[in-house]
Amino acid sequence: MHLSELTHPNQLHGLSETQLEAVAKQIRERHLEVVSNSGGHLGPGLGVVELTLALYQTLDLDRDKVVWDVGHQAYPHKLITGRYGSFDSLRQQGGVAGYLKRTESRFDHFGAGHASTSISAALGMAIARDRQGLDYKCVAVIGDGALTGGMALEAINHAGHLPSTPLLVVLNDNDMSISPPVGALSTYLNRMRLSPPLQFLSGSVEESVRNLPFMGGEIPPELNRLKESMRRLAVPKVGAVFEELGFTYMGPIDGHDIAEMTRTFQSAHRVGGPVMVHVVTKKGKGYPYAEADQVGYHAQSAFNLSTGKARPSKTPKPPSYSKVFGQTLVKLCEQNPKVVGITAAMATGTGLDILQKALPDQYIDVGIAEQHAVTLSAGMACDGLRPVVAIYSTFLQRAFDQLIHDVGIQKLPVTFVLDRAGIVGADGPTHQGQYDISYMRAIPNFTVMAPKDEAELQRMLVTCLNHDGPTALRIPRGPGEGVPLMEEGWEALPIGCGEVVREGNDVLIVAYGAMVPKAMATAKCLAAVGVEVAVINARYLRPLDEALIHPMAKQIGKIVTMEEGALAGGFGSAVLESLQEKGLAIPMLRIGIPDRLVDHATPQQSFEALGLTPDQMAVRIKQHFLLSTSGSLTLEEKAPAEVSSAG
């Protein structure tokens, strides 16, 4: 059977092991073909090909439900559930999503882009099934990295106390999440994998039996059952922690042996309560470059399949904000040994891998545990350290209570660097950093800021570390503006002070963070047709520079706010509230992300869809204030009518 003919996972039923291995080979080839051309997650999916086929062979996917944790390991799932033909559109606007979406396929039973949610969701489905008297299987597939998340452990604790609720949890143990996982649980799993008796059983004994002349290289079912019995006798402590929590534990088993996994899953389905099947896989399996560099090939931009090297950019790009942050933090850590960088399993993405290599003693990775990262930093700040916590904007949402309760209320000097703030592109709605402006501005005692470029980022980082209180600094994904950077000697900025970056008398734009360069470009568009626009780089969300904004707003009489974040409760709302509290009724337009989710696309496509390109914003400003111009604005017809504004 060719993979293109496989439109329903139930077509796997009855295929021989040889046929399934042929399908596995085709899945890897298609996976590599598409990701090498368009980019996407590579290593996670390559590691679960056999696991997916073996699991789905034992299920009726017209009834049974599988919840994949995070979703970036589910590319093989997509390829055998009717998306082979459309897979070329992976992570492209209007195409196949990089994560699971309930609206994309009836086989995507639960959407996810954040880690550690699968067991809770699958358990919820199992409880709903039992309460309605229905009969179908509920399965969660979770990686060992995601298992370090507190939510996953909470779900295991709950499921273990429901002995009559059938639930299968498949632990995909590849000793990796995005970076190598950390903590006692990871160490425990590693001990289980490397247990000498288990290695002996899985390796030497099996190889000896296969090599017997009358075996023909095959292991008969009777000896497989004997091997499993010997495994349990020889390694009695394997899985003890899960069994103490109420699960029936099976494994560890080879995650690339379809026959062994199929037998184990069939046995697991016969158990009447929660079962944990521990499957050991190799991230990047089948592609040597991905096997050799499991961190680098977790996710890739387009690359040359034969060399494994990224395709060169058509035009050179400045260093990313994340890289500038990481390099600057190293310098500041060298100057002050009390500064410590903290990440939640995202060292490479946030730039903290630079600190990890340079000053490992001033670097901490807590694993996928954002709540713990925040309160850990609070405790460190209590006793004299200056923690800098670098977390993606979308992931810091998971620790909102800790931001308030453990840091904000106690006025502790912790710095949060919110990476990937704003539009992120192809990862879609689960990863857009569109909410942090709204949630951070609501927390008392925080000073919240965003730089207009990478040079201002450096000064803001110094400002944060000099400030005796909690601070938050948001930075966008992607390259900086290409401005000159200082190697050291950065000066702190005055707290709560913005700056005028362009003079004008017709309209005032107050822009926040990454929208400042777009505001300048918008002003240039309007200047070309005779409208002179003043631009303020706000710098601060909390506290606002009212002393600068209010007089200019009164003098000019028309004000526009620009932010790369949700309009609801965002920067524009802060400015509007500030004006109203002072009784200043000034005509106003708020520009930002309206009340909608932003789907996967390139950042530029997202900006266009949201009406956030300079020419579109120039048209909106002209139309909103009924401005007279000396000429026509270009691309006027492209200004999207659906993007809301507030006056």
Curated annotation (Swiss-Prot):
One of its GO terms (molecular function) is thiamine pyrophosphate binding. The keyword Magnesium applies. Pathway: Metabolic intermediate biosynthesis; 1-deoxy-D-xylulose 5-phosphate biosynthesis; 1-deoxy-D-xylulose 5-phosphate from D-glyceraldehyde 3-phosphate and pyruvate: step 1/1. It catalyses: D-glyceraldehyde 3-phosphate + pyruvate + H(+) = 1-deoxy-D-xylulose 5-phosphate + CO2. Its EC number is 2.2.1.7. Its cofactor is Mg(2+); thiamine diphosphate. It holds the Pfam family Transket_pyr. Thiamine diphosphate binds at residues 72, 113-115, 145-146, 174, 287, 370. Keywords: Isoprene biosynthesis, Magnesium, Metal-binding, Thiamine biosynthesis, Thiamine pyrophosphate, Transferase. It comes from the Bacteria. GO terms for cellular component: cytosol. One of its GO terms (biological process) is thiamine biosynthetic process. Binds 1 Mg(2+) ion per subunit. Mg(2+) binds at residues 144, 174. Belongs to the transketolase family. DXPS subfamily. Homodimer. Catalyzes the acyloin condensation reaction between C atoms 2 and 3 of pyruvate and glyceraldehyde 3-phosphate to yield 1-deoxy-D-xylulose-5-phosphate (DXP). HAMAP family: DXP_synth. This is 1-deoxy-D-xylulose-5-phosphate synthase. It comes from Synechococcus sp. (strain CC9311). The gene is dxs.
